[in-house]
């Protein structure tokens, strides 16, 4: 169902051998900008897209905001009637939080040497060391792409930061389990 093989060092490794890195991005309130600023942002985004020689995926995640911790704090500090007013308002209003992500792909190229390596008998430790070296080289290529995207989108006023392993796991977990707001995520190592 989900093509994720593993997540290592903030890198999503797919079952087909591809890699994905995820940047979390700040937002820009485009509607509050002047016409000149909007034009500059639009041109900056167009220039950013034109510099890419690989595809990216822009993901916007909208979730209903859980205000229960805030309401609990209000109950401690404010009179009961004000807390009830806020509670009824939050029940009626659909207060949302939005998160913005850019997913950056990298697909390693299979070299001729590695494609015939299955013909040779090598020890498990040699194969493991070679696989780790290959992973680090491929991850370095993905990190270059992540840096290119973060710097490119930065020209529009958007800050982008790569997610670490735990943040990627949480993002995937929350994406595939949208109804579970308060349950902690179990990381089985």
Protein language model features and the residues they cover:
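An aromatic-glycine-centered, glycine-rich loop/turn in mixed alpha/beta architecture
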Residues: 1-3, 88-189
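N-terminal basic/disordered segments at the start of proteins
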Residues: 1-16
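Ordered, soluble secondary-structure elements with a strong preference for glycine-centered loop motifs
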Residues: 31-39, 53, 136-143
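N-terminal pre-first-transmembrane
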Residues: 46-64
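Short hinge/gating elements
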Residues: 25-31, 132-135
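An amphipathic, basic-hydrophobic helix/alpha-beta surface used to engage anionic
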Residues: 21-23, 33-49
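Structural flexibility/helix-modulation signal
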Residues: 64-92
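Active-site-flanking beta-strand signature of metal-NTP-handling nucleotidyl enzymes
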Residues: 19-28, 100-106
């Amino acid at each position: 169902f989900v093509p994720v093989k593993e997540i290592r060092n903030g890198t999503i490794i797919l079952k087909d051998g591809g890699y994905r890195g995820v940047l979390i991005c700040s937002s820009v309130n485009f509607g509050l900008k002047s016409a000149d600023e909007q034009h500059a942002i639009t041109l900056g985004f167009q220039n950013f897209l034109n510099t890419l020689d690989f595809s990216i995926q822009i993901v916007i995640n909208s979730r209903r905001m859980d205000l229960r911790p805030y309401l609990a704090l209000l109950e401690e500090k404010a009179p009961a009637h004000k807390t009830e007013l806020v509670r009824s308002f939050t029940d009626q209003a659909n207060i949302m939080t939005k998160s913005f992500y850019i997913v950056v792909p990298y697909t390693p190229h299979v070299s001729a040497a590695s494609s015939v390596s299955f013909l040779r008998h090598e020890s498990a430790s040699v194969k493991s060391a070679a696989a780790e070296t290959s992973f680090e080289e491929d991850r370095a290529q993905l990190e270059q792409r992540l840096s290119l995207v973060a710097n490119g989108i930065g020209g529009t006023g958007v800050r982008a930061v790569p997610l670490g392993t735990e943040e990627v796991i949480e993002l995937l977990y929350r994406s595939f389990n949208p109804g579970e707001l308060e349950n902690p995520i179990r990381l089985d190592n």
